Amino acid sequence: MKKLLALAMLLVLCTVLTGLLTGCKVSAANTMMVDDTPKVTVTSPDVPVISTEWTERQYTVSEQDETVLLTARYQIPVLTLTGSPDNSDTAAKNRQAAVQRINDWFTDWRDQQVDMLDEMEQMAREEYKITGGERWKTEDFAYRDEAGISWWQNERLLCVTLSYVSYTGGAHPSTWRQAVSFDLSTG
């Protein structure tokens, strides 16, 4: 319960800081998710636009009898720099380096999630063996690990909320969120 309260307080703090850092004004370039699709509106030619494509990786682990033991799905953004008001080589290189650092962070994060799948797979196989697969005969029963993303962006910041759902055979799945903010000029 203390961890949940601490996470909630962190999310509120990130939200307040984001509002303060953006000066509580309408940004020149706003990006939001609309119907699970990123929408970008640029209202000033002086703002470089960083566009985002989504990549999703899915994993499935099955028993020899084709019973699905574990499914995993991880969604991460892949940022690309699509415009630049300043064509100097140094500024363009700095922005590109920032975008690369952000992309590397998300790739590393996803790889850490995938690394934990080995442990989940071992747990699922052990339970399957112990129970004779009885629980897996229930419709849609399988261990599950998923992470999706919602985000907000202006000309200076990219704020991301990672939403996790993990199920390992208990009464209900575990859910939690992690908020991360990136400075678009430094990554």
Residue spans for each PLM region:
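Positively charged n-region of N-terminal signal peptides that target proteins for export
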Residues: 1-6
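Sec-dependent N-terminal signal peptides
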Residues: 7-13
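C-terminal motif of bacterial Sec signal peptides marking the signal peptidase cleavage site
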Residues: 19-23
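Bacterial signal peptide processing site
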Residues: 25-27
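Active-site acidic/histidine clusters and adjacent loop/turn architecture
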Residues: 40-156
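Short, surface-exposed coil-to-beta transition loops
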Residues: 144-146, 164, 173-178
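Generic short beta-strand segments
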Residues: 161-167
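Short helix-loop boundary/capping segments
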Residues: 177-187
